[in-house]
Amino acid sequence: MTDKKIPFVGLHAHSVAGSIFDAIGYPDEHMDFCYENGGEALALTDHGNMNGFSHQFLHWKKMKAEGKDFKPIFGVEAYFLPSIEEWRGEYNRIKEDAKLAKSLAKSGTSGATVEDEEESKKAIKSVLNRRRHLVLLVQNQTGLNNMFKLISESYNEENYYRYPRVDYAMLDKYSEGIIAASACLGGPYAGNYWANREEGPEAVREAMRE
């Protein structure tokens, strides 16, 4: 290990233990590399899960036994929506509208406006795939317990389609001991910026306040 400490802690990193298509290396490899280059702590934030937690925890115990002063930060990069109830409601409305249009077209009902089937499929797919990224970090034991509960709930049928999701209500329920950060370009702040940038800086600021 280098004797020079680096005044930087990475709070957003993926491992092949939980983000196989978006990572290089297992948690222990990340931790060793960080320590050997002067790092004193590192967060692991895999996509939608904490599958790397046991790797991270056990390797930390090994490092500790070897006299290496290093702090693992447990976390996740969650898939976030403001309201899962509204998301589900929008999906159900689009799905029912598409079914109704198809039924009216088949029955030859006069005056029926038939939507393009491909456009309907795109609309449904767009809603179903909707999510933002949000980095959540464990602050203490209470936070770790709450993080496990939050992630477990995100995989419930009503919250899951291709991706496990959390919303404001769930975050409020399990907020104690958890720190939230804005993640990446897929995060809510960056998303609001790109969606409103052509409207000017005030529109961007207002969207971010919301």
Please provide the spans of the model-predicted regions.
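Phosphodiester-processing cores and adjacent nucleic acid-binding clamps
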Residues: M1-E210
